[in-house]
Each structure stands twice: as structure tokens, then as C-alpha cells.
Amino acid sequence: MANIRTLSDYASSPPRGSSALEGEVGQGGSPLPLFFPSGTQSGENVSWIQWLCPGIHLKSPIIIISFVQIAVYIASLAAGLAPNEILAPTPQTLVMFGANIPELIRVGEIWRLICPLFLHLNLFHILMNLWVQIRIGLTMEEKYGWKMLLAVYFGVGVLANMISAAVLFCGQMKAGASTAVFALIGVQLAELALIWHAIQDRNSAIISVCICLFFVFVSSFGSHMDSVGHIGGLVMGFAAGIWLNENSDIKPTWYDRARLTSQVALAAAPILSCIFIFLVPRC
């Protein structure tokens, strides 16, 4: 099995006043495992599955979620194929399967905040989301545990859908698990920001961030793509990542301010979203 790269692979030396760098960062997980996920021992044979998704195991919650998403995607295609697109369900099918439609959420169809996490718009959409969420999710599960992984995936994913519904309300239909996927990316970016002062190979980290931003750019276009949800998931995931690392021994000097800001953001976002979705006159 491929080794999951830890934060110590990026860190050069303990910051002043800290001697626990190597011990703390070796608890699994790494910044942006999507692009620099693992290291293999010399002569180790790694299967293509382990190369694509290091540390994969079928009992992982993220794997189970992925299988459910595949089943839902196949069912949505069976319900109706969109013309002139590659294996894409029709808009009517997306509505039937619970797409994010703010006007319907306002009248009580609350399930439309979570159902989009299992929907995909076309073949490229589901393949990209599955690869990213499995690759990052496995690393997050190793570091934070499966319960926290699920809390971030569904909690921040639903919150991002709420933000999207609050911002783009009238005549909108949005779908896709990308809001939750961007939440996972946000957590990884937060980790990277928190250990930046201790990173030895910053060039690799910069390349990783650039590739991440390219993914953000590419994933934000297309019919029914939820660009606001992507940004909401990324920002709220970043805030969650700041909070999740409060016990780190290599926190930067600005951590306390960042933690307070993240807590305020995570508390205010659902309240403001509910106000704009359910109380503020729209359309």
C-alpha cells in the first residue's frame, strides 16, 4: 500500500519555541493530497488504483458515498438523457431527483439542500468529483477520523448549498456534489496555510495551489454548475479547516485571530442564509 505523505514531508524545522513538529505532523494527512498525496518506498510496487487513490479501502465512508453517487447517477440517466451532452441527465430529471431550487426550498422542500450532494450533471462531472473526493477524503479520514470527515462533507456541503440558494434565488436550478468536494479542498488549503511557515519545498506547494485553482476555475462553468456553491464550499471548508487544527503544535502567530474569524463565519453563514432564503422577499 502506498504511504500517505504527512505534514512532516513538507516541514523543514520546528518553529521557534516548538520541538514537537515531527511528532505532531506525523498523525496522518497532508496539505493538498490531491496533487502530492503519497510517497512510496524504493522498489515498492503500487497498483494503479493505489496510485490514483492512495490508502483506498472499501469500508471508508467516502467510498460508500461514492458508490451511492454512482448509483444515483445511473438512475438519473435511466430516467432521461439530455440531448447533445455526454451521459447527462435532463433538467427535469435533476428536478425530480432533488436539485437545489431555492424557490421550492422556501416553501418547505428542505431536502433539496442535501440531495444535490448525490447528483451529477454529466460523465466528466462525476468522474472528476469522485477522484477528488476519494483522494482527499481518504487522507482526511486518516487525520481527523471518519466522523469528522462526514461532518465536513455533509455539514459544509449543505451549508454551501444554503449559501448558493440565498445568493442566487430566482429561477435557479443547481446540482452537484461539488459543494462538498470544494469543502474538502478548503480544509486542505487551510492546512497548507497553517503550516506554510514550516514548509521546506514551497515550490511544490505553490504548484499544488495553482492546480487547485485551475480545478476551481474549470469546475465553475457549465449549465446548472453551482459556482456560488463552489466558492461557498471552499470558503466554509477553509474556515472548518482552521478550526479543526486548533490542537496543532505548529500553528502560526495569526492562528487565534483566524480561528475566531472562522468560528464567526461558520456561525453566521447558516443564519444569514436562512434569513435570505425564508424571510427576505425575493423575485
UniProtKB/Swiss-Prot annotation:
The UniProt entry annotates the active site at: 178, 230
Family classification: Belongs to the peptidase S54 family.
Lineage runs: Eukaryota, Sar, Alveolata, Apicomplexa, Conoidasida
- Catalyzed reaction equations: Cleaves type-1 transmembrane domains using a catalytic dyad composed of serine and histidine that are contributed by different transmembrane domains
What does the UniProt keyword field contain? Hydrolase, Membrane, Protease, Serine protease, Transmembrane, Transmembrane helix
Q: What is this protein called?
A: Rhomboid-like protease 2
Query: Where are the compositionally biased (Polar residues) regions?
Result: 1-11
Which Pfam family is one of those matched by this entry? Rhomboid
Subcellular localization: Membrane
What are the TM regions of this chain, as residue ranges?
62-82, 114-134, 149-169, 179-199, 205-225, 227-247, 260-280
Q: What is its EC number?
A: 3.4.21.105
| Region called Disordered, residue ranges | 1-26
Primary role? Serine protease involved in intramembrane proteolysis and the subsequent release of polypeptides from their membrane anchors.
GO terms for molecular function, please? serine-type endopeptidase activity
Query: Any signal peptide, and if so, which residues?
Result: none
Biological processes annotated in GO: proteolysis
Give the membrane topology, semicolon-separated if more than one: Multi-pass membrane protein
Task: Give the gene name.
Answer: ROM2
Q: Looking at the UniProt record for this protein, which Gene Ontology cellular component terms does it annotate, in alphabetical order? A: membrane
Kindly report the protein's main subcellular placement as a broad class: membrane
Q: Which organism is it from?
A: Toxoplasma gondii
